[in-house]
Amino acid sequence: MYSGVVSRTNIEIDDELVAAAQRMYRLDSKRSAVDLALRRLVGEPLGRDEALALQGSGFDFSNDEIESFSDTDRKLADES
């Protein structure tokens, strides 16, 4: 879907958001967090290895459970 061409880019980014993404998805670098976020935003499906890497990341809810979360539940989850 995409060319796979990689370039170096300097960006100003919220360190707290990056750290939260790294914790949530157990990512080992800022680059991994930004890469995952862009792929999810653009909609490119995760490859098999990428999907397996997320296994056990702590996100284990059904769609029904997610839809039933209140704002308070979401805030508590963000704080953990």
Swiss-Prot record:
The heterotrimer binds 1 Mg(2+)-Mn(2+) pair while the heterotetramer binds 2 pairs. Both metals are shared by the toxin-antitoxin pair. Antitoxin component of a type II toxin-antitoxin (TA) system. Upon expression in M.smegmatis neutralizes the effect of cognate toxin VapC15. Partially inhibits the RNase activity of VapC15. GO terms for biological process: positive regulation of growth; response to hypoxia. Induction: Induced by hypoxia. The keyword tRNA processing does not apply. It holds the Pfam family VapB_antitoxin. This is Antitoxin VapB15. It comes from Mycobacterium tuberculosis (strain ATCC 25618 / H37Rv). The keyword Magnesium applies. Residues 60-80 are annotated as: Disordered. The gene is vapB15. Its cofactor is Mg(2+); Mn(2+). Mg(2+) binds at residue 67.
